[in-house]
Amino acid sequence: MIQTTVFKKSTDSGNDLYCGIVIKGHAGYADEGEDIICAAVSALAINFYNSVEIFTDDGFEGTAGQEDVQFDFRFTSDISPESQLLMNSLVLGLQNIENDYGRSYINIRFKEV
């Protein structure tokens, strides 16, 4: 199963501000190379990383594919509205996969930091 942890901060306005994410594990939906859930999650994560890097000036640290952690991303500076939109889009995509295929393949949890 893919385990996803989304890190969030509460704001004075009552909205959550997503400030990082860790994605690890394998869905186990199909054999390696044919697992559409793993492929979809990977595509979302890589596109998010590249989009933050290219379209924003926000500071971040990120790693992909090291040991059992497939993707680890944390903002290291104030989060711009553009980056927050990209993060919201990533979380929405992951939640849609979880809703469509079930928690036996991907589980998303939110952690206050």
Model segments located where?
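N-terminal intrinsically disordered, cationic/polar leader segments
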Residues: 1-36, 46, 50-113
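Short, conserved glycine- and acidic-residue-centered signature motifs
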Residues: 37-41
